[in-house]
Structure formats: structure tokens, C-alpha cells
Amino acid sequence: MMEFDGRGAPRWKVRPPAARLCPLLTLGPHPQFTGKDLLNGQTDGSSFPNGGLRATHCAGAFLTIDPESPPFILGDTMYLPSVVAAYTGVALDEKTPLHRAVQALSKEGVKLLGQLGLKTAGLVNNIGLEQEIFLVPRDAYFRRPDLQFAGRTVMGRLPGRGQEMSDHYMAPLTEHTPALSCMQEIQERCFKVGIPLKTRHREVAPNQYEFAPLFGSVVSQTDQNLVVMQIIEETAAKYGLAALMQEKPFQGVNGSGKHNNWSISTAEGAQLLNPAQLFAKTNNPDVFPVVMAALVSALDKHGDLLRMAISSPGNDFRLGAMEAPPAVISTYLGADMTSYLERFVAGATETYTPRTVPLSFGVDAIRPIEIPAEDRNRTSPFPYGGARFEFRAVGSSQNVSLVNTVLATITADGFKTISDRVEKGEKATAVARELLKKHFRVVFNGNGYDKSWPAEADARGIWRINSGVEAIQRFTVDKNKALFGAFKVFTEEECEARQEVLLNHYIGTVECEALTMVDMINQHVIPSIKEADLKEHLPAVAAACKKVHDAVHALHSAGDTPKAAAAARVLRLETMIEARKVVDAVEAVVPANKWTLATYKELLFLDSTDSQWGM
């Protein structure tokens, strides 16, 4: 089916079926389906979120196939991963900027490594994405308008048991509920479209689960993760379940993330974040500390951009909530690596070899094993893990294109900072030592949940942005527009458009949640109170409902988009939370047979409560 011309470009030719099989082909000048139709296309760009880049009177958007992300067939449909640009050439998708950033990373990395004596054809950016989800009974889901319309519960009293017993994480998937069969089919369907889901297991919260794939190219892995999310939702419905991707669908139990395990290597296979393998490939002890200096400095300089990239609406409830990393952008390197880099800054030229230590179980029949000398720090947003960094703060519902666009861009900037000075006559190791000394404040090996850490982070001068709305607005500050422009990742116009899209998404999400809350109070809570003859609670509930309703209307008169987004955040994190307290207190006293909404007990205990599966 596929041929290539002399320049290596794909040349597809699809043979039309015989006329007897397709009579339309015999009806005069009807166009025939050709290979060109698979390579290129066009659509209406004004109907997608575009931040003003397109309008109804100038709506052209053009697509072309992305050769770095393999096509696949799902059901009766062939999917061709593509990139999308406007008639004017600006990117309308999230993938084109990702390609641009990875290209910049490779270009700057090749240049710096060449200065260190390591010739390479290019750099490869790999990721592995851990996708967390909730699976809840579908019959209960349909009795929760908030889950249907907003993806999270805007009210709901905690049951007598949550995750206090710590008995869900890694527990066996039992066969008497559909969760196991559902997850097996999800994995099988993913295998059939070339997505290698490696693991499946329970997570910490009740009804919370996780899938994780083998590592792969950042572009194809990003595409494939979106397909995984689609397959999860479709398959869950088949088994009488509903899949929840939102970061915080339930109050009082852990929310969901999507850990973005991130690494870079040369085209020839030298892993730049694996010190032992890198030295074996290069025989140069300077490469690893120089790469680490570039990354540490990039993280310190551009932590605001990393915080911006994870500002999904649901992450407002997770970051800093003792279940996900805090909103402070720092990195954990571990005592061993930290000590090595401190010696490097002091002038040492030793090769870094990660230490291992023996672990004895104290049982004669079980042999001791060798383990890494470093522990794991789950409170760090960007910990080093031996051959990769793990960006732990990404939200479960997110398309990770922007996250990885930012990571690639700031790393390219770190590489360029060093290589530009080397071109002027400085030594790469000397520049790396200076950068590490200046930016080492971003390294924090302690407990990110410690109440003293935010104040210490402020004293260090590293990035801490608690508000997702404020973080989104870092997209268009001068330093960041200049950074993206320098590496041709985003134009100023593209930065401004994406900020507008992100803010409008936040506003729209909150408005949907708030209006759903108002409807649920009026259509379910108040009738339940009346049915239970608990009318003394009506004034407080009605007043709370009115506050939420009035706050929604105030959004529309807030002025510009940033002001509306700031007002939406107050509505969500203050007004709606106060209303929820009132409603949840009422749920506690209304008899179960009078309460029409599905309760947390019905939603959260798929494996341990009576249900349609006969438990």
C-alpha cells in the first residue's frame, strides 16, 4: 500500500474498487478516493477551542499525517494521527508545538554533546505515562448529575469508611465484580492497536485503578494515552461501569494523577539520565553532570511554566493536599546524587556510579538483595529516579502535550545556555559548576508535605504558585513568550491564544459544576428534605443555593477573561465548598430511602457492597 519516492517521502496509492463493487465510481466526474486523501485534509478550525486564532469567516484548518505516530484501526475506523494548522500557519493543535519543542531539544542537545566530544545524529525524548482512573457502578453514576456533567461530585457525605484501612492499594482484583474483566479487556484492546500496557493494578482510593505502558517516543506515547483514555471509557460502559478521569471526583479520598516519566537519550542509545550506562557509552565523566546542570538550571528558571502546564481545573484540589506533590516546583535528587553534584561543583572530576546497598530480610531461606542507595520521595513534583525524572504533578484528565512541550523547551534552553558560553571559549564543566551553584536551591530532598516547606521555598526564591488561574497567566509573561519564540515553539499569538483557551476551559468547568450543583439542590436535595419532613433545614440550603447561583451570574459581568477566571476560582474553592458543607450536613440526617442521589457508599465500594453483581 505504501511506497516511497527518491527522497524518502511516502507515496500512497489506493486502488479504487471495481465498478460493480462501487457503482458511484461509474457516475461521471465523481471524485475518487486516493492516497492523497490519507495524507492531507482540511476542516473547520473555528469550531475548536482556538483562542481567537480562527473565526467563522476565516475558519480554514489543514491537517497532514504525522509519520512519528503510527496509524491504527479501532472498530471500523482507521485513525491517522495528524497535525493541524490554520490557513495562516499558526498551530491549532497541541501536537505541532510538541514536535517543535522536541526538535529544539534535539538540535541544542546535539550541539552541546558535540562540544563534549560525543557525536550523535539526534536526541530521543521518551516518556511513560501512569494513568489513574476511578471505576464506579454505572447505575449509581446515572443517579449523579454532577458525575455525568462535571466528572466530579460537587456534594456528597463521606461514608463511615474511606481509605483509612489502606487495603485497596495493590490488593488482588477479584473476579466477583466486573472491574477485573473490564481491565483485562481494556488491556487486550490496547494491545490490538499497538499500545503496550504493561501493568494494571488497584490504587490507593476505593474503586481507583491504574494502567501503565512501556516507555516510548513522547509523540506517540502522548497520542496513545489519549486512545487509552477513550478505550477505558468505552469498555467500562460495556461492563456496567463508568470511568472517571477527573483529578478529584470524590472528596475525602485520593484523587487521580498521570505520572509523566521522562527521559532523553541519543539516537544511538546513550541514555543521558543514566550515569552508569552513559559513561559506558561515552567514556566521558563530564557528560552526565553537564546534562544535570542544564536540567537543574532549567527547572529553577522556568518552574512557573511547569506549574502552568499542570493547571488543569481538577488539580486545584490535588496539589499540596497531602496526596499529590505541592504547588512548589522543586526536584528531589537523593542524598547520593546531591553529594556527587556538590563534589563536582567543588572541582571533583569523578565518574558518578549510583550506589547500591544490600537489603537483608532477616530470614535464612530468603537471600539478601541489592537495592538502590536512594529512597523514593513521593512528595516531590519532579524526582530523579535513576534513569529518568518523574513529573508527578500532572493531572489524570490532561493531554500531556503541553507538559512535555514545556519540558523539552526548557531543557533545550538549559543546553543552549551552556553551549553558547562554550562557543565563546568557556569550558562546559566550568559553566555547569557555575549553574549548579546558582540554581541548586531548587533541589529539595526533604518532605514536601511538611508545613514549613512552602515558607522555606519562598525564602529560597523558587517557584510557588498556589492558584492554577495565576499559573496559567504565566504563559504570556515576557520571559516566557521570549523563550518559546527563541526556540520557535510558540509565536506570541499562539501563546496568547493558548492562555485564553486554558482560562476559558477553567471558567467553563467551574460554571458547569456550579450550575449542576444548583440543579441538584433544587431538584433533589430540597425535595428530599420536604419528603423527610425536615423543613427546618430548608432556609440554610436555599440560601447556600442562591449564593452559588448569584456567583455564577457574576462571572458573566467580571470583565476580561483573567478576572472571570479569578472569580471562578473563588466560586469553586470558597462559595461552592461552603454550600457543600450545608448540603452534606443535611444528607447525614435525611433517611436513606428519601435521598434520591447515589451516595458515596454506593459509588465507592464496588468490591465490598451489595450491588447488581450479587455481593
Language-model-derived ranges and their functions:
Residues 1-245, 250, 254-258, 263-502:
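Glycine-rich, acidic/polar active-site loops that bind/position phosphate-bearing ligands
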Residues 438-615:
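C-terminal amphipathic alpha-helical interaction region
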